[in-house]
Structure formats: C-alpha cells, structure tokens
Amino acid sequence: MGSATGKDGIQGASFASKDITADSANDLPSVQVGDPFQEKLLLEATLELAATDAVRGMQDMGAAGIICSTAEMSTKGDAGMRIDLDKVPMRQKNMKAWELLLSESQERMLLVATKGREEEVNAVFAKWDLPCSVIGEVTDDGMLNFF
C-alpha cells in the first residue's frame, strides 16, 4: 500500500553506502523521488491499523524494495509468499521484474492482513485516500515465489 512503484530508488541503499564523487550525479535514478505528504498519510494509516488485530505483519519497502520486505516478513513469520508482480501498482509502464523487486520507497508498505479482515484494512486505507492492492498471498511452504 502507498505510492506506486517507479524506477526511481532502484539500488538506492547501495547508492547511500557509496562515497559521493563527481560521478555521483550519474547515479541520480537511484535516489527515490520522495513524497512527504504521502508518507505522512501512510504513517497515520499504518498506526491506525497497528492498533487493531486486522494486520498480521507490516514491513516498509525501503532498502531492496519488495524482495527484501517479503524475505524479512517470511523469515519473521516462518512462512513463504507468492507474489504476482503484474499486480504491483506501477508509476511507469514496462518495468522489468528486477526493477519492481528492487525499487525502494519510504511511501510503500507490505502488509499481511488477518484472514477475513481484508475489507477492514481496505477501509482504513480508503479513509486516508491511499491505494492498497493485493499482490500475493502467504504460504506455508517457506518459499518466496515471484511470478
């Protein structure tokens, strides 16, 4: 939920770890295009949901984007996930799978809703005028699958 995925922010964590040089301007696409207002709305919505039991887990899509957030959540929850990359909301057309997986943004969160409470989660995000999309499901096989 939150902002749509774009090509900005890809490998941003790697960029942030490098020394800044005269050539760093060539790496500007690695820098995320921030949206502080969207981030504030997302913060409010996630705090509201965190106070309920409608959510099983939440993870930001900061460093390494979807690939890292799904891995972290799956590990913490001792579960797996199946993620349909075609369902990931995109700001730009024709993004490659690796771009979708590695795009980093502070205005996006991965959330696992409690089974049967999905509409409640959607209602909170609608209240805050934030997009929310189902991009996959939790599995019990311990594997991460992206297709």
Please tell me what each predicted stretch does:
Residues 1-147:
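Glycine/proline-enriched, intrinsically flexible loops and inter-domain linkers
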